[in-house]
Amino acid sequence: MRVLAKLGLALAGAAVLAGAAFAADTGVLTNNGVLDRLMAGTGVWHKAPGTTTPQFVVDPSWPQPLPHHWLLGQIGGLFVDRHDHVWVLNRPRSLTNDEIGLSDAVPNALDSRKIPVNGLGFERPHGPAADCCMAAPSVLEFDSAGKLLRAWGGPSDPGWMEKHCRAADGCIWPGNEHGIYVDANDNVWIGGNTAYGGKPPEEGGAEAAGTGPRAPWATNKLGADGFILKFDMDGNFKMRVGGTPHAFDSNDKDGGINGTPVFYQPADIVVDPATNRLYVADGYGNRRIVIADATTGKYIGHFGAYGNNPVDDAAAKAAGRWPDDLAAGRTKPMFFRNPVHCVKIANDGRIYVCDRGNDRIQVFDKNSPQLGKPCSNPDGEAGKCGFVGEQWISRKTETLPVMPGTAVSMSFSPDTAQSCLYVGDNTNQTIYILNRRNLTELGRLGKAGRMAGQFHWLHQVSPDSTGDLYTADVDTGKRIQKFLHYGPAGCSGTGFATVGGAAD
């Protein structure tokens, strides 16, 4: 089978790196059953009868080992660009003391006991505490073979902030990295989702959460991460959109730097190459999708659930959690619940939104003249305010703060019709493969666990042009993975009308 050869070559390549004697003989891998076991254990499961989907198997050799004793922390973002390069947004501040034992004290950084500390605030009175390891920079670029091409940015890249992300230029690195996107012009966009910790600092309040005295490499101390940043591929700062708010406001249009809209903990970013419009999933505090000009950052429009504009923040906050609504029979919330976690645009103009706080996805038409404009759709009707349809994703799943909710990330298969919709679920730890035409479930990829091909807090899903899938985990998952595609290029047939639910 082609996939056995493909995976065998990948594993043989890994063996070469490790110096294994059997590296050149991929037949050994086939004969001892390793490849068959990988295919059986990490392939598509819960397949709907009479349907077709791409097939996958994990590549346990990807990525290649990182240099400089670097380790990845939680992965706040992952995206495959037009060159089939994989861009990763690492959270170095999520690493624990034992994971960064090789890190030394930061010059002049002391804790409350006047003891030298490293960049994450862990005490280093005698220099490095162990032989391993160091936090990798925040932005990393890999090729499809897993080779690291570039790495830059953030609080674990000493000296970079002073040169490339200066407050005088408008750059503020987020307190917690979240979301990365590379547009058709090779601009790198990132966001963050730190919440504001209390009153403004000038009024004696707390600093933004996660940027206190434990973090001498603290970045955003002014408020919540209410902005996104634009860089070139080498990490040179180009623009900031947004500000550092102290409260959420899902209808802000121009409260940020240079009159740009202020976000509140934005989660995801995409740029439409046909219109140069920037779409932001806003987010962990606000409850909307923002549309802005990708060159100037200026506001164009915004919309909430079912295309409603303005967004009723008060009603959403008063409603509480989705499981409570569901238990009470209120099964059609007229607002996004936090977090609004992703926004994606298909080639046919459909916009897909992860309404993670409501365990659902919603679909909109980017070409609708009503989308983003003041519009009322009180009954959630398709065809009004740019709204097209929706699908529940394991809708009985608990949401924050009990469980993280379901619809966390989406992407499309690279066939001409983009016929598959991949939906990541970071509570049930799987990727649902939907027929994008009818939003029925055709199968699943991955299960909960720590082994290759399994997930813990699955956070991102992104394909390359060949159909291979790349994934990223947060919480204690802290890894990126590659799934090799084989078999059909796209999806067809009508699967299970209900997406999610317990299955073997």
Regions found by a protein language model. Name each.
Residues 8-19:
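Bacterial N-terminal signal peptides
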Residues 24-504:
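Eukaryotic scaffold repeat domains enriched in small/polar residues
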Residues 1-6:
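Positively charged n-region of N-terminal signal peptides that target proteins for export
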